[in-house]
A protein has these predicted regions:
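Short glycine-rich phosphate-binding loop at a beta-alpha junction
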Residues: 49-56, 114
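Short polar catalytic/cofactor-binding loops
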Residues: 9-14
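A glycine-/small-polar-enriched, mobile loop at the entrance of the PLP active site in fold-type I
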Residues: 55-63
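Acyl-thioester C-C bond-transforming condensing/cleaving domain
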Residues: 1-4, 17-45, 62-66, 73-165
């Protein structure tokens, strides 16, 4: 049986207040910052060999929605070929993400996986913040297809490859 190992761990400071220094920091930007640091710490691991990004998030909505694992991986500079998945298991979402990543490695399906958790309560506090901060402006400008719904993606694929209905 293959063995899964944790190569490193990084965490951000804990934001304790709606008036604190991190209260307006987007969770996808914060997670991307952590991922960039992990990449910098381990230059011997080529980012092209990362098989997946698995991130737990108890409230995957608003600024934390739209597959924060995938969005953060793009912001961190991982190749567009690296998929991402967001897992919601409420308080144990981050632990579940690490377990899922380990299982993927142990089963032989993948070799290198980013795994962890992200949460920012200040960005999901009320309905206006959920909608006001939903789309990351950097991602919208540089990777707009990340926000496409499946129907739009299907239309692009159908047109690109001449697939009839």
């Amino acid at each position: 049986m293959r063995e899964a190992v944790i190569v490193d761990s990084i965490r951000t400071g804990l934001g304790k207040s709606f008036k604190g220094a991190l209260n307006a920091t987007r969770p996808d930007d914060m997670l991307a910052h952590v991922m960039k640091e992990m990449i910098n710490r381990h230059p011997d691991i080529p980012i092209e060999q990362v098989d997946d990004v698995v991130i737990g998030c108890a409230f995957p909505e608003g600024a934390q929605g739209l597959n924060i694992a995938r969005i953060s991986s793009m912001l961190a500079g991982l190749p567009v070929t690296v998929p991402g998945q967001t897992i919601n298991r409420f308080c144990s979402s981050g632990s579940q993400a690490i377990t899922a990543a380990a299982n993927q490695i142990i089963s032989g399906g993948q070799d290198i996986v980013f795994a962890g958790g992200v949460e920012t309560i200040t960005m999901i506090d009320d309905g206006s913040r959920n909608t006001n901060h939903m789309v990351n402006p950097v991602v919208k400008e540089n990777f707009p297809a990340l926000y496409w719904i499946m129907g739009r993606t299907a239309e692009v694929v159908a047109n690109r490859y001449n697939i009839s209905r």
